[in-house]
Amino acid sequence: MPKLVGKNGDEAVPTCGRCDKSGRWCDRSQSLRIRAQKNVGKHDEAAIHALGATQAKTADIRDPQSALQDEDIANYFEHYLKELAPWYDLNDLDMTFAVVVARRALRSQLLLSAIIAFAAVHKSRTGHAASKTLAETHHAHCLRLLIGLDNDDIEIRDGTALAATCLLRSYEILSEEEDPNRHLFGAFSLIPLLSSALPSEQLLRAGLWNYLREDITFSLINECPLKIELGEVNVEPRRDDDYASQITLLLGRLINAAFAKEQFTVERLRQAVSHWYSTCPFRPYHESHGSGFPRIRMLQNCHCAAMHYYYVAMCLVDVSNARPARLEEYARLICGSTFTANNDPTMRCEVVEKGR
């Protein structure tokens, strides 16, 4: 005999759908009593007020100069300048993301909204008081602006859109438990074709190097070739960060050859990497080895990052040639130089052992 149930139904007559599915019969002998939930009004009022304030801040960003008069927005902007921009300028002595991006954000709502989204989510994930709702709202606003761009728009041609996408890529990594790589893949359409020369526009060039480093990390973790086509482009080293860019290109080409099982190309690139190391003008000013990781100190972050890529390149060569004897040595060198780096951005450098 079906059970009599007097609650949890959907009030359909004669029998609610829930009871019909489970073989029960609704008991309607007593009237339905509805209990009010306490404090709903206060909670909703506070939530609506917070949402309205967040939306107002986003609307104001259409005028970046006015938006930065808001103390919260100014604090997030300053957090980007002090803490986050150095992540992107790791191999850039011109500090393009700290200087050019920041200056351009004063008149670009696309860049400013990307900066605020990234800075807010970073603060929320690192124990600071920060609004995740604000980060999400600015992220959505930035995406709408990006989607609305045409190929001929100046923000595509001058690197603004690519720089914003690089910032959103970092937002994506911090805001989600699993990295969906949406912005990494999306940035691919903004990358200029590389045939024999790098782009002349400074911000476009800086965005390209950042995208390439992200592409390298993704390829190492997933053991696949790069998405970006490197062509025959090369860097003529004139200063120290040029050497870091040069080894970045060599590592990218080596990744393509190693995962495509092109042993002849791997050997040719091994010789190029060895030549790079022999001509590289910087070395550690201190190196000591104990029972733990070695302590390796270098003058500049770009020196440390360049040597990281050199060690990773040599790991790939050894794996491709089935010579794993020095893999642990290279891994220890990477970790040692990271833990004794000048400052935090280098800690974010491409230390790929955890992905390998």
Task: Please annotate each region the language model reported.
Residues 1-95, 99-108, 129, 135-136, ...:
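Charge-rich, intrinsically disordered regulatory segments
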Residues 63, 169-261:
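Acidic/serine-rich, low-complexity amphipathic helices located in mid- to C-terminal regulatory regions
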Residues 80, 98-104, 114-128, 137-178, ...:
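Hydrophobic/aromatic-rich effector regions of fungal transcription factors
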Residues 93-96, 227-344, 352:
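Cytosolic regulatory protein-protein interaction regions
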Residues 113, 162, 205, 209, ...:
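Start-of-helix signal in alpha-solenoid helical-repeat scaffolds, especially tetratricopeptide repeats
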Residues 127-131, 323-324:
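Structural helix-adjacent loops and short alpha-helical linkers that scaffold large soluble proteins
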